[in-house]
């Protein structure tokens, strides 16, 4: 039955909220979006909780996979023919765009979850026709099944594309596990339209041209910069500014930027030989019969030489299916002028180019076309610093190859996490500083050794709050987004972390000194990383004892101590906490509310809403507030692990009153006297209906023990977030 005959449709009860138009956030847009804490659970994962991807990947015949991928590169399909009979350029673009969404500020984006398969990325204008690349890979994905994730396959396909065209890559590591629905936590920008120029409503720029943090791309729907120029207006020097900002936010320096731009454009071509206005919608907006294909041209041929993707048209080099130094040869040999592609996009073409330097047509080798350069390519020629590097690479091809190989590996592996997560036979032996290396430990402590250390910590001058706060501060830097930070490595001892305001340097140094003395007195080989975590557990056990409960906080030894040489101090600046709701601290006043910042940190720490709730309640009664403040400490028995925070939060004997920015007073309803003070973070657990439901559970008389058990479980999760060896 046709669905286009609206008058013939039958009425049907339809009570499910099956699209995004009717949700509580439309009615109450200021509601906390707790859904970002509940993504990617096993209800959406078809593999089930017992599936171990690492074991599956390690059972692959890896050489066979690579051979199949290399064979695919030259197996052109009629439904989407390969340029010059080689899919290399398409596969490299797919891999680049999978990895290129990574931004260093919050570690989100990147290649490690296969998110290019889902909205919004699968429908970004800059990802045009990458749906075809993934469909070309489907026979290989189907063949190897659960052993090879889409996330790993897309990056490996990019590597094999380069190798099939004569370039030796630096290596490849597997270990990227697929997600199964769009990521709800990533902020891609406030714009409401694709490719919106700067200066309009919901603009991501302020001031002269200050890009909003944590964004890296210059426009909604682009991976990095606009190939036509800033806001579509060619000006290589202005584009160079955008490139420097964008690539820095992708964790790349100038040398890596030049290498990646040149290496990415040494092969393949851009597509703009047609009318973009006739293209069908992107995959998410396509008709059901299109089966997830977007940007279809149903009015003309629309494939091969007639493909339209970015609108820019042409190859960058003379031999687009061969790795060589031709990119720099053309860039510096010829003068270039601004032209328009058949699709109307601004691009640069050479003046008076020799015929032998012109690439041949993708379908007919008897025809030659002008090569082209984007505004980003011309930036390498016009920007003085970029030009120095580009000329050096032109004159030293081997240096260029090495720099590009390393930069490509970094681009495609940055968000995979530490080297301990790497899988497969092609993992490079060399340790790289951006991997945040941590040395392995060579000791194993017996239970008696651990008990002796715990007793020494318990008998030291350190308070419960000092022990717990220091362990928390060491572990809270962990980001589940790119798996950076955490307690392993004990980089809280090193610059810059030891001097971060949020770590209370004076208190931190006191605790570290005492712990180091204990380690020395006991002649213990234990790392400071392990000792800091062990000490936090001692503090919690003492607090539970003070509440009348005897517990043991699980402790998994095996953390190493990083050194300054192993640490790129500048790269850790982005991990510095400027807020921590768990310790009731804000470094400054922010436009974003304190409770939203708490949600942000909780999501990066991979906490559920329940875990976030129980941790807040426990941290408050342990007295771990920054600076020892009393905000939210709803107890007369600080240092005892009780459920007092939740009991008093939900007690109707009190009323709540604003008392300044992010400050509230809790007054006795009968007398009007102030009993406690609180922050917005504290109050949200009583005001938000979902969080209050959790708070009520922990306030119940029969859940005192459950509160302690759940707090310990959540605490151990935080301490072990970066223990990928467990």
Swiss-Prot record:
GO terms for molecular function: catalase activity; heme binding; metal ion binding. GO terms for cellular component: cytosol. There is a cross-link at residues 224-250 (Tryptophyl-tyrosyl-methioninium (Tyr-Met) (with W-96)). Keywords: Heme, Hydrogen peroxide, Iron, Metal-binding, Oxidoreductase, Peroxidase. There is a cross-link at residues 96-224 (Tryptophyl-tyrosyl-methioninium (Trp-Tyr) (with M-250)). Its cofactor is heme b. Pfam families: peroxidase (PF00141). It catalyses: H2O2 + AH2 = A + 2 H2O; 2 H2O2 = O2 + 2 H2O. The active site is at 97 (proton acceptor). Formation of the three residue Trp-Tyr-Met cross-link is important for the catalase, but not the peroxidase activity of the enzyme. Heme b binds at residue 265. Binds 1 heme b (iron(II)-protoporphyrin IX) group per dimer. The record marks 93 as: Transition state stabilizer. Its EC number is 1.11.1.21. One of its GO terms (biological process) is hydrogen peroxide catabolic process. InterPro entries: Catalase_peroxidase (IPR000763), Haem_peroxidase (IPR002016), Haem_peroxidase_sf (IPR010255), Peroxidases_AS (IPR019794). SUPFAM superfamilies: Heme-dependent peroxidases. Belongs to the peroxidase family. Peroxidase/catalase subfamily. Bifunctional enzyme with both catalase and broad-spectrum peroxidase activity. Homodimer or homotetramer. This is Catalase-peroxidase. It comes from Vibrio campbellii (strain ATCC BAA-1116).
